[in-house]
Amino acid sequence: MFNTHSVELDWGGRPLKLETGKVARQADGAVIATYGETVVMATVVSAKTPKEGIDFLPLTVNYQEKTYAAGRIPGGYFKREGRPSEKETLVSRLIDRPIRPLFADGYRCDTQVIVTTLSHDMENDPDIVAMVAASAALTLSGVPFMGPVGAARVAFVNNEFILNPTLDEMVDTQLDLVVAGTATAVLMVESEAKELPEEIMLGAVMFGHKHFQPVLKAIIELAEQAAKEPRDVVATVNADLEKEILGIVEQDLRKAYSIPVKQDRYAAVGAAKDKVLEHFFPEGIEPRYEKLRVLDVFKDLEAKIVRWNILDTGRRIDGRDLKTVRPIVAEVGVLPRAHGSALFTRGETQALVVTTLGTGEDEQYIDSLAGTYKETFLLHYNFPPFSVGETGRIGSPGRREIGHGKLAWRAIHPVLPAHHEFPYTLRVVSEITESNGSSSMATVCGSSLALMDAGVPLKRPTAGIAMGLILEGDRFAVLSDILGDEDHLGDMDFKVAGTEKGVTSLQMDIKIAGITEEIMKVALTQAKDGRMHILGEMAKALTAARAELGEHAPRIEVLQIPTDKIRDVIGTGGKVIREIVEKTGAKINIEDDGTVKVASANGESIRAAIKWIKSITSEPEVGQIYDGTVVKVMEFGAFVNFFGPKDGLVHISQLAASRVQKTSDVVKEGDKVKVKLLGLDDRGKVRLSMKAVDQTTGEDLEAKQKAENAPAAE
């Protein structure tokens, strides 16, 4: 019934198996990839006819994790998987980025790649397995895909690179880098690093590229057994059309792409486009070409003219040379009520970044296949349509916003203080108010400034820069701080973030083959120079974290209590802790290990809550004086609540210095008194004294008497 084919190899010390022909046989391509005991299924379906009226590849990639893969049932009311998690969105992008450039030019058939994690062994992260499975399914599908693509994760532990580290090995790593590419080229890099030098980052990229070569061979071997007949893609020859359009608007486009202001430039390009459309589509005459084809060629010519100008003159669209960074203005403290804020402007790109300090109650609970954990650093990136002078949708963040936010998160995360040193939940929000390239790196710069403005003690300020590359034959140009147009028209764009010490994040997308290790080395060196310049400009606003937290930020104090006292602080049904919170106004968070975090914007509120907690968890000391409340009056004395839930007896003989006939003559229930702990009687009952304490000042009268008698005795 099944015509199965499979290949197996040892990869990174674990078996990798790729199998097809048994599951999802109605898809154009389907592969089950097994790595250790992590199992991922990838399917590809592509429409048989092109989609009309579009000039792009209609490709959709969906990665999904099923909770049954980890032997769990989803939470929530409906008990089934819902909207994609952040990780699912990020892995979908990881799969999409290296495969998209490899589809044949002009392919316009709706294509959907669905990748599903079926089993997770808690050792091997499914993301790399998902990338391999998707590549294999595309290679088998008959879709015009110029792959296969391989992928690998690289860690750096004890000065050594590790291929596809397990989840346990990732705990100690200084680097988390994912690299993908073909046999001859690197296509994508995504990483987070602990301030590593550029040489190690590049070494990790080449290490990963070298070690996923066996996977490429395995996919090719499987394709030789089971690949479908490749689909025909008719390449459109546009040489004559291109020559005709050049004759009409070449000079117009060259002038347009020398206008530095984005909106003015777009207007000039639009006028050139209208001129072409008027030429090819006059009223009342049958057109010689399809409109979409003319516009496609026009767009290609835009790219060529920009590239020619840069390579021939060394000058860019806005007049800069290859290495110059646009003018920078950095400001902090721009919002009066925010805990920390910054406005970072670089040319026509601008980010308003705001930091908010929160408590343990604000931590984000993340439910993943590997288990539930709490995240104390959140970074959210918003890209409203007005930032590019357009109208558009406003609502929940899209994939691009989630991806850019995570890139900035990776750049900042390595320089944050340890949570036990700075026990706050941090939320950073970047509002992109203007955009003309590199808004994610503006977010990195603005986030660093806003965090320091809030008093968060970062290890070092962090900056980011977006780089571009244009390659034509043996000629190439590396561009620092690219514009939006240069991003679209170049062959490689990569973003590097870091401190003066080293790189914290590197993201790279390469659109063509032929980019060598030497070219990447030149690009990384130029990026470092640009980063240092940006750090210098940021230093004009702020060089380190402010010594004090913002006026409106909460204060957090941390104390440790014995774990067996946690129940006493919480009380039956939370009664005690609710009372502390209500009466002091402080927020209290208690961890299972006895760590207690007390937070409030009011220092007095924190001190009152801590005093209350200590009164519950500490043992009273003999000879110490305590504030108390009379809770019961008896003939023989009064019971006083003096140390949290603890009560003690003030015998009638200890109520006052003079003889007392009736207890009620001195105290009544509810009276606030000061008592001294005398000790325990034979039955273990607490003995207290009021007469040993000045009820007005709280002074220890016994100690005072002893001090006065001491000189007389001498």
UniProtKB/Swiss-Prot annotation:
Its cofactor is Mg(2+). Residues 623-691 form the S1 motif domain. It is an enzyme of class 2 (transferase). Mg(2+) binds at residues 487, 493. Gene3D superfamilies: GHMP Kinase, N-terminal domain, K Homology domain, type 1, Nucleic acid-binding proteins. GO terms for molecular function: 3'-5'-RNA exonuclease activity; magnesium ion binding; polyribonucleotide nucleotidyltransferase activity; RNA binding. GO terms for biological process: mRNA catabolic process; RNA processing. Its EC number is 2.7.7.8. SMART domains: KH (SM00322), S1 (SM00316). It catalyses: RNA(n+1) + phosphate = RNA(n) + a ribonucleoside 5'-diphosphate. Pfam families: KH_1 (PF00013), PNPase (PF03726), RNase_PH (PF01138), RNase_PH_C (PF03725), S1 (PF00575). Residues 554-613 form the KH domain. It is found in: Cytoplasm. Keywords: Cytoplasm, Magnesium, Metal-binding, Nucleotidyltransferase, RNA-binding, Transferase. One of its GO terms (cellular component) is cytosol. Belongs to the polyribonucleotide nucleotidyltransferase family. Involved in mRNA degradation. Catalyzes the phosphorolysis of single-stranded polyribonucleotides processively in the 3'- to 5'-direction. This is Polyribonucleotide nucleotidyltransferase. It comes from Afipia carboxidovorans (strain ATCC 49405 / DSM 1227 / KCTC 32145 / OM5) (Oligotropha carboxidovorans).
